[in-house]
Amino acid sequence: MKTYATLGPACCRADLLTELLDMGLTGFRLNLSHTTLAACRPWTEAVQQARAASGRPAELIVDMRGPELRMGTLPQPVPLTAGETVILGPGGLPVEPDILAAVAPGQEILLDDGLMALRAESCGRAVTCTVTRGGVLESRKSITLPGVELCRPALTEQDLLDLDAAAGQGVTAVMQPFVRSRHELEQVRTALARRGLEHLTIFAKIEDRQGWQSLPQWMDACDVVTVARGDLGSNLGLLHLPAAQKDIAARCRRAGKPFLVVTQLLHTMTEHPTPTRAEVLDVYNAVLDGASALMLTGETARGRYPVQAVRWLLDIARQAE
């Protein structure tokens, strides 16, 4: 069983990363949705220092931007209150034009893995929305348009620049968002080969219905299938997420394909030192379903108890095995 923690301000010191590796953690994920690989050099250097100190070949996965939809950069967090009107696009919250063009009146718009929700009222160069579920919106948070598919390139210009820097920063794997076809993975492999990085492991994220349903067509083109429950839950609806995870697990088992489960495994531990019983059962059952890897995100990136979260993840996985 492989286990990963997401890098962030809460854990990115060489001594702390060394402690996590000594506990048995396999490696780390670096989320590039909010930043660039070059800007994260202090963090990747901390990983390399931890590798040397622990004597363990810790994996370093970079999670690419890819075709996923995201809010632009905000000067400061924006509170959204249920019932209020907000504008997306010119004169309002920064959203890319192709996203705005895909929105029709009545469209539900989910933000930050569904934590907040809007309903589109009128559409044009800008989209006027009503907040249906409030919260505090931060820069670069995810946008989901349930039922809408946008055609975007597998790799952005920034992704290609990040791959240019990968060899010099100890990267061992890439995680490709919103995989829906074999062609997208072939594009990733070609980009890696052009940089002499064909040895890097490719994690392919399933984040919508199309990616889930087309899994048999592209499964063998990646190294590890990733059940990315944040956007997958937003796109399918939470009630359909358990069936999707079970089905993906069964397909991977039959094909002998390794798969990873990620998102809110121990979410409570972002703020509390122990998980809930439901979280313990969730992780335990993921192992019983055949998961070959588990990954923490906010629990270690920004949580108050990163060491305890990793310890719980390791203990639950070992107990299940």
Label each residue range with its predicted role.
Residues M1-E321:
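Non-catalytic helical/linker scaffolds that mediate oligomerization, partner binding
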